């Protein structure tokens, strides 16, 4: 873990163990952060190298020196995780990886916002720290949280909040935000959200702005759209025996990951559950873990931010159509 980007990696032991059986080759850490997971993988598995990517320039700047001790086994790039396919192909072409070893032996997505992003007030992620409404993972590009809350209409804001768990008071909150525009700071917006919710309800369930800020952050960074594309590309890049591990922290992320993995592991089978498949589906993947894993009680005690984590993992068990098991075109 980088001291310049101090983020405790969640479920690192589980990640390392789950990647132990994969074939020698390249693992993508698609959410590099402080490089805690990447360093653990490289230390435990000499047969693996890591391409670490992150869109946050502060994470990249901190992770590169942290991984320098691993030499050519570690490569760091600043990019979004939905750019993974192009990055992998360029890296393997540049380094002369043989055709039968191209693709990914593994991939890791540790989703959501990191501790340094939450704890640095100026980033605007936290409802507890007053700061400009920003929330961009990459602070050099794209729309800000201020753009979202000041430009989205009532129906769009309401739908955004509902999709991210704030179902009961989503429209009341959207109306309150619109009525008190413009918004420029997290502290002021947090108070608007708090005041929109009945006092009796505010006494339970944590801070009323938590889910609203999460929803705004997801919209600012287009997290679900990018995750959807990234998972499709990553699953397609997996070699036979390769695994993709995803750690999610809220229901929207987890639903998307679960749906992708279930579809891949059934080969798109449309037959009724419990009956033999007659639709001709031919799965190329299997679920390594049925359902999801949660962090241990000890880990939650050490790191309260790990409490919401859900880990899912899938493995490629067959070569893609038109390729042999060693990756060559048939």
Show where each model-derived region lies.
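S-adenosyl-L-methionine-dependent methyltransferase catalytic core, i.e., the SAM/SAH-binding region
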Residues: 1-330
């Amino acid at each position: 873990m980088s001291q310049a980007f101090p983020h405790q990696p969640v479920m690192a032991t589980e990640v390392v163990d789950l990647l132990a059986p994969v074939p020698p080759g390249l693992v993508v850490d698609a959410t590099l952060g402080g490089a805690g997971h990447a360093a653990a993988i490289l230390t435990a598995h000499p047969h693996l190298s890591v391409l670490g990517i992150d869109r946050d320039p502060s994470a990249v700047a901190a992770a590169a020196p942290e991984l320098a001790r691993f030499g050519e086994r570690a490569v760091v790039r600043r990019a979004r995780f939905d750019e993974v396919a192009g990055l992998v192909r360029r890296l393997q072409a540049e380094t002369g990886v043989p055709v039968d070893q191209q693709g990914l032996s593994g991939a890791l997505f540790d989703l959501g916002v990191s501790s340094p992003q939450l704890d640095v007030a100026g980033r605007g992620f936290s409802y507890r720290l007053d700061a400009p409404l920003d929330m961009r993972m990459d602070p050099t590009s794209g729309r800000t949280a201020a753009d979202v809350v000041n430009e989205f209409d009532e129906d769009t804001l309401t739908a955004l909040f509902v999709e991210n768990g704030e179902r009961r008071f989503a429209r009341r909150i959207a109306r309150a935000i619109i009525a008190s525009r413009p918004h420029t700071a997290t502290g002021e917006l947090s108070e608007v959200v708090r005041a929109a919710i009945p006092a009796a309800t505010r006494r339970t369930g944590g801070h009323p702005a938590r889910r609203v800020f999460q929803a705004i952050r997801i919209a600012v960074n287009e997290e679900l759209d990018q995750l959807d594309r990234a998972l499709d590309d990553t699953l397609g890049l997996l070699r036979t025996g390769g695994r993709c591990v995803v750690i999610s922290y809220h229901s929207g992320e987890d639903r998307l990951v679960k749906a992708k993995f279930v579809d891949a592991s059934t080969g798109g089978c449309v037959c009724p559950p419990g009956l033999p498949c007659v639709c001709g589906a031919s799965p190329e993947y299997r679920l390594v873990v049925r359902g999801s894993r949660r962090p241990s009680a000890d880990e939650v005690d050490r790191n309260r931010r790990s409490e919401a984590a859900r880990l899912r993992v899938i493995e490629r068990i067959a070569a893609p159509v038109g390729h042999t098991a060693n990756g060559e075109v048939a």
